[in-house]
Amino acid sequence: MSKLMLIGTNYWYPSKFGCTIFRKVRFQSTLKCTSTARTQPIDPSAKTIRHLQFVKEIPFETGIDIQEKFVRAHLDIKQLQSKIKREMTNLQKEHNAEIQLNFHEQMILDNINQMKPNPIVLTFQFEPTYTGGKRVKKQITDEQIARYEGFIPSKQKYNKKPKFVQAERGGQVTFHGPGQIVAYIILDLKTFQNLPAKCLVSTIDNAAMNALKVVPKFQGSDEPLNLITQKTNDTGVWVSNQEKIASIGIHVRRSVTSHGICINVDPDLSYMNSFTMCGLSEKKATSIREQVPDSSTSVNDVAVAFVNQLAKLLGITTVERIQLDDLPIYTD
């Protein structure tokens, strides 16, 4: 039995619909997203959020593969449900009457509806990796990539060299590595009330800010970190106008989200501050350790606090959590 089966059978659906089509979507909304704004689930599947917490460092590409499997599960079920809805509509038009299902047909439809995955948050700590967002996809040169992959801080000379990987998220170049939590948020925006993409981004920011207040300052302690952060005109979460502690970038396909946020707990900041990150040449990265040197809070502590705060802001009352070292990925 794979580890994935431990989570629940409604998490995994092999793809039967071929390749997923990536669509460029521009989200426009007049809905104002504020720090006090709240949404709530409007579909039963969204009332529980599941947190898969990876507690060991893994390659960035492995994390992306794991994320894509869960995104495809959402997309495949949406496609199946849409197909059933179209067929039912066509039958009603053909017979000019409402279609009455027998017991077994209704049971099949009910089972399909219950297969819809819950919102899921994957939290990782990656091996050193520079990732490019969509804004640099056609601009970055081989020479620039070589500089990223050739940069080895003096304290990291015996550790793995960084890689450069192009990612399907918004934004420009950022860094993921040890000492940093990366949280990928996979959910269907349409299963929540008034939650366009821009409001999800605001919700993620607010969850990170709240987590940095309430996460334990010391492992096993009830004393909160109480690190005060803010938003600025630039994306992400900031300790000051010049010091960024969390970066955000999401991707949306047919209302299903992926990617999310990274929060600096105790990374080697020279990976970030030796280059221009997120296109902000005059800004610098900071971390919990730099801001609160005596804190012993860990990446895993911050991961738990972030997911709990995200659930609150989404109006979700149940968080199911499982800790994993790795998750086998099987291809068709």
UniProtKB/Swiss-Prot annotation:
One of its GO terms (molecular function) is lipoyl(octanoyl) transferase activity. Residues 115-318 form the BPL/LPL catalytic domain. Substrate binds at R169, G170, G171, Q172, V173, T174, F175, H176, S247, I248, G249. It is an enzyme of class 2 (transferase). The keyword Mitochondrion applies. InterPro entries: aa-tRNA-synth_II/BPL/LPL, BPL_LPL_catalytic, Octanoyltransferase, Octanoyltransferase_CS. Keywords: Acyltransferase, Mitochondrion, Transferase, Transit peptide. The record marks K244 as: Lowers pKa of active site Cys. This is Octanoyltransferase, mitochondrial. It comes from Kluyveromyces lactis (strain ATCC 8585 / CBS 2359 / DSM 70799 / NBRC 1267 / NRRL Y-1140 / WM37). The gene is LIPB.
